[in-house]
Amino acid sequence: MAKDDVIEIEGTIKETLPNAMFKVELENGHEILAHVSGKIRMHYIRILPGDKVTVEMSPYDLTKGRITYRFK
């Protein structure tokens, strides 16, 4: 899969799950399961419920995503 095949959308963290997984409510109202990208994990950026984040999603599976940015 090429990098340009991803869908980027903003959302809000609703719930923290085990293994660095999160329930994210997207702007359009859908709720997806998302994990933290390697760069965020590498820099020990904490993500808490209520944080606004950017999520990358594959067009093939719209129920899962990757958190790539946490807004300040």
From Swiss-Prot:
Q: Which GO terms describe its cellular component?
A: cytosol
> SMART domains, per this entry?
S1 (SM00316)
What InterPro entries has UniProt attached to this entry?
A: NA-bd_OB-fold, RNA-binding_domain_S1_IF1, S1_domain, TIF_IF1
GO molecular-function annotation terms? Answer: ribosome binding; rRNA binding; translation initiation factor activity
Tell me which UniProt keywords the record has, alphabetically.
Answer: Cytoplasm, Initiation factor, Protein biosynthesis, RNA-binding, rRNA-binding
- Asked if the Swiss-Prot or TrEMBL record annotates the protein with the keyword rRNA-binding, the reply is yes
Q: Could you tell me which residue ranges the S1-like domain spans?
A: 1-72
Which Pfam family, just one, is annotated for this protein? Answer: eIF-1a
Question: Where's it found, cell-wise?
Answer: Cytoplasm
Q: How does it assemble?
A: Component of the 30S ribosomal translation pre-initiation complex which assembles on the 30S ribosome in the order IF-2 and IF-3, IF-1 and N-formylmethionyl-tRNA(fMet); mRNA recruitment can occur at any time during PIC assembly.
Physiological role = One of the essential components for the initiation of protein synthesis. Stabilizes the binding of IF-2 and IF-3 on the 30S subunit to which N-formylmethionyl-tRNA(fMet) subsequently binds. Helps modulate mRNA selection, yielding the 30S pre-initiation complex (PIC). Upon addition of the 50S ribosomal subunit IF-1, IF-2 and IF-3 are released leaving the mature 70S translation initiation complex.
Task: Report the sequence similarity comment from the record.
Answer: Belongs to the IF-1 family.
Q: What is this protein called?
A: Translation initiation factor IF-1
**Source species, please?**
Ligilactobacillus salivarius (strain UCC118)
List the taxonomic lineage.
Answer: Bacteria, Bacillati, Bacillota, Bacilli, Lactobacillales
Q: Which gene encodes it?
A: infA
